[in-house]
Structures are given as structure tokens and as C-alpha cells.
Regions:
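Short hydrophobic/aromatic-rich motifs at helix boundaries and adjacent loops
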Residues: 26-28, 74-77
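A short, acidic/glycine-rich surface segment
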Residues: 38-43, 75-81
Length: 97
């Protein structure tokens, strides 16, 4: 099996509207917006029952997507912002502008 393309990157934010506005200014287009909730969604993430507002944005070339999430339940864990650069997990997403 070989990689064909990068499909999407997920980011959790405090304000979905602010994030959509920011990435729209950079040239991404809003592809869709929805609320995802229920036990089935919790099974995917391992968080149990959850309620999340999501927005899917697509890059101008149409090759990649940015999935922006705002968790309503369970509450977000905010202390990751003080994590050092070598902490496991998401660190950055880079775009050519």
C-alpha cells in the first residue's frame, strides 16, 4: 500500500466562526458545517458521548482539507497550549501562500 495524498488535518478550536473566518482569509473555502453527536461519534474518538460542531474547509487546489472542531461536550482540554515542542501530538500545519 502506498500513500496517494493527504486528505485532511484536524484542529480543535475555541471559536468555529473565528477559525472559519481566519482560514477563509487565507484562501480556504468552507465545504460544509455540521454538528456531530452521539455514541457512534464517541466510539470513533474514544471520548464516549460527545457533541462537536465541525467545519470542513478545502484548500484552493482541492487536494487537502482542514477539519475544524469545536467540542461542546466533553469540554476541551486547554492545557496542551503549554506543552513543549517535543510533546507528542499535533504541532503545526503549514501552508504555502
Amino acid at each position: 500500500m502506498t500513500l496517494k495524498r493527504m486528505d485532511n488535518v484536524g484542529i480543535v478550536v475555541e471559536s468555529l466562526d473565528t477559525a472559519i473566518s481566519f482560514f477563509t482569509e487565507l484562501g480556504l473555502k468552507l465545504e460544509g458545517r455540521a454538528t456531530v453527536e452521539g455514541e457512534w461519534a464517541g466510539r470513533v474518538t474514544g471520548l464516549g458521548t460527545q457533541r462537536v460542531e465541525i467545519a470542513m474547509m478545502v484548500t484552493p487546489d482541492g487536494h487537502s482539507r482542514l477539519e475544524i472542531s469545536r467540542f461542546l461536550t466533553p469540554p476541551v482540554v486547554a492545557d496542551h497550549r503549554n506543552a513543549p515542542v517535543n510533546a507528542l501530538g499535533y504541532l503545526r500545519v503549514m501552508f504555502t501562500v
